[in-house]
Amino acid sequence: VLITNTAVLFCDAAAWLFKGRMDLLGFYAVRIANFCVFSFGYILLAVFTDYLVCFIASRGFGILKFPARVMWGLSFTAIVLVIISQFNHMYYLIDDNNIYHRQNLFWLSQTFGIFCMLIDGSLLFRYRRRLSRAELMAVGAYIAMPIIAMFLQIYIYGIAVLYLATTISALCIYISIQVEQSHKFACEALALTGSRRPSGLRKTMTRPNS
């Protein structure tokens, strides 16, 4: 998830870096970067659903792979529409000055993400009683924040609100995982220390008096 999110941020930065440049490198860089921003964004949705399914399964609960397959299908469909938009410019247009402009159907590109996040939200709601509070908050933030950002992105132009939200949410999940692992290691160390104490105590009690 973090790797895919990093790829999205890198492509978004490249799109801003090369916009307006009239040389050959700028011409191709802006077009490739904007295409990758859309495509990697959809791939990120599918990768996260895969992660969520595996995350729930790792807790010992049976969960079908069907939601992940549906998400990959939706992501593939969305990418196909991005390819089509390169010819009919329904999502965006890059003008003669090598500047990106939204088009009338840009909102459609965002609805795919909103719908995919709702699927993830339904999974989280269904298995909410089987996850800890910290896990629910971390995963829930990754679902809720991008949904809010997608709505805002439709109306806010010039600021990558969506990618900032996904980055912050991914960091929340990463921090949650690190905290959980630290707590697990601390509990294991405490249990190991407790298992050694009775043995040492028995040796002390059975030692003959001098």
Question: Each predicted region: which residue ranges?
Answer:
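Juxtamembrane loop-transmembrane helix junctions in multi-pass integral membrane proteins
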Residues: 18-35, 59-66, 97-104, 130, ...
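Membrane-interface helix-boundary motifs at transmembrane edges
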Residues: 1, 24, 53-67, 124-135
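Interfacial "cap-and-anchor" motif at the non-cytosolic start of specific transmembrane alpha-helices
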Residues: 123-189
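Hydrophobic alpha-helical transmembrane segments of multi-pass membrane proteins
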Residues: 1-53, 70-88, 139-154
